């Protein structure tokens, strides 16, 4: 391959060699070079992103996934699931440019599994990894957690940002100081995002909460179905010879959902996803159900549970109205509580999330909008004031507790027969009828 590029693309090869020896870590290939010399991406990938012969000093250091884990996150080893090295194997597969589907339990380290290869690609190839996530709270949480670890290479572009913050994120992607970009699937229809990604070498597309692909999943998101079309557009515009690798992650997936995800990428992009599935349970979670007769009794149980343990608490409700009302009632009774739901003012929602994540507020009363991917290690209690609308959603939401394996966390459901009627009514309201 090297001899071929020497003879056929000497200018592109010379450029890549010069870029490799640039002193600045954030030196990237300008957009006009990518557009006029598309082979540059292939050469850069061959030189810096492909493991080569045994004994190569570059590969031994820069493509060493254990060294990267220690360098970026100061961990000595990858997490095992029932003595299986699934996390390590998934990272290794990504670094060797395979497309994967990883099913890890909540709190099982799935974020680190795609962050290590993304940071390595940014450092080695000046490349950008795009992480597609369904929730704004998840994106912000991930970026904040990386910054706490001293990693400032990630940015997000979403509706929670004001115009100045959005402009700064775009600038950082353009100038190469960001190598990880978190966006929502809806953003893929934006011409700004399209232009932004065409101006960078793309290392990989990561799809978080991949169960949103499947009509069999409770969180089906139609915008996820556009992802393959967008990737195909980027590949065509960049004139790429090889498909951009893809990583899909989810914590809960039925066999039908797994089949849907794999079939989607096989049919749309001719990409085979290698499966990494963990068969393990969360042994540090304690589950209990309280059967309550009326609202007053239920609220008293809620108060008693919160008072019984001094720890961060998430209280889930099924409606925005209930979340706001319950948070206010708890505050009136002397508890440090705030609400979080989809109908809140964007600024207020961001402030409430920040306060809870930083430990300034002990209790967050939320709808499922405060769900997937929220990563606060010390949550010691999750209380469902009303039952979830599916078992899958319950596993996701209860899994917010006890993400630190060294603590024991409690998951309570305050059950009332009337809750089932509420969910049945909501389901009927969303049904399409032909008249």
State each model region's role.
Residues 81-83:
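Conserved SAM-binding loop and adjacent beta-strand
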Residues 45-74, 85-89, 95-101, 105-111, ...:
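Helicase motor core with emphasis on the C-terminal RecA-like subdomain
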Residues 3, 7-11, 77, 89, ...:
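Intrinsically disordered, low-complexity Ser/Thr/Pro-rich tracts
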Residues 130:
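ABC nucleotide-binding domain signature
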């Amino acid at each position: 391959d090297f001899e071929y590029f020497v003879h056929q693309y000497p200018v592109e090869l010379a450029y890549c060699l010069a870029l490799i020896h640039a002193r600045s870590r954030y030196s990237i290939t300008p957009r006009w070079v990518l557009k006029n010399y598309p082979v540059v991406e292939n050469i850069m990938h061959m030189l810096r992103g492909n493991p080569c012969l045994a004994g190569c000093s570059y590969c031994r250091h820069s493509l060493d996934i254990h060294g990267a884990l220690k360098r970026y996150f100061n961990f000595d080893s990858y997490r095992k699931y029932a003595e299986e090295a699934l996390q390590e194997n998934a990272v290794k597969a990504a670094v060797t440019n395979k497309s994967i589907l990883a099913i890890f339990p909540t709190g099982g380290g799935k974020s680190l599994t795609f962050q290590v290869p993304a940071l390595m690609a940014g450092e080695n190839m000046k490349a950008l990894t795009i992480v597609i996530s369904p929730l704004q709270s998840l994106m912000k949480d991930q970026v904040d957690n990386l910054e706490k670890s001293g990693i400032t290479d990630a940015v997000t572009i979403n509706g929670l940002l004001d115009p100045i913050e959005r402009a700064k994120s775009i600038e950082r992607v353009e100038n190469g100081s960001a190598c990880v970009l978190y966006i929502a699937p809806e953003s893929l229809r934006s011409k700004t995002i399209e232009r932004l990604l065409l101006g960078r070498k793309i290392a990989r597309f990561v799809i978080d909460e991949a169960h949103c692909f499947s009509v069999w999943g409770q969180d089906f998101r139609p915008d996820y179905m556009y992802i393959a079309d967008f990737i195909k557009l980027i590949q065509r515009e960049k004139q790429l010879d090889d498909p951009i690798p893809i990583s899909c992650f989810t914590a809960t997936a039925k066999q039908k959902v797994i089949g849907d995800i794999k079939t989607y990428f096989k049919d749309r992009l001719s990409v085979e996803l290698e499966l990494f599935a963990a068969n393990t349970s969360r042994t540090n979670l304690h589950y209990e159900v309280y059967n309550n007769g009326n609202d007053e009794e239920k609220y008293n149980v809620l108060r008693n549970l919160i008072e019984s343990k001094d720890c961060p608490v998430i209280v889930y409700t099924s409606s925005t109205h209930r979340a706001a009302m319950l948070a206010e009632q708890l505050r009136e009774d002397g508890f440090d509580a705030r609400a979080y739901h989809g109908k809140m003012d964007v600024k207020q929602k961001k402030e409430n999330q920040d306060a809870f994540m930083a430990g300034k507020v002990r209790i967050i009363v939320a709808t499922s909008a405060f769900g997937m991917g929220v990563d606060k290690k010390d949550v010691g209690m999750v209380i469902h004031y009303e039952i979830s609308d599916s078992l899958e959603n319950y596993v996701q939401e209860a899994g917010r507790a006890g993400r630190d394996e060294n603590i024991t966390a409690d998951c309570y459901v305050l059950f009332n027969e009337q809750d089932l009627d509420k969910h049945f009514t909501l389901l009927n309201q969303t049904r399409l009828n032909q008249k």
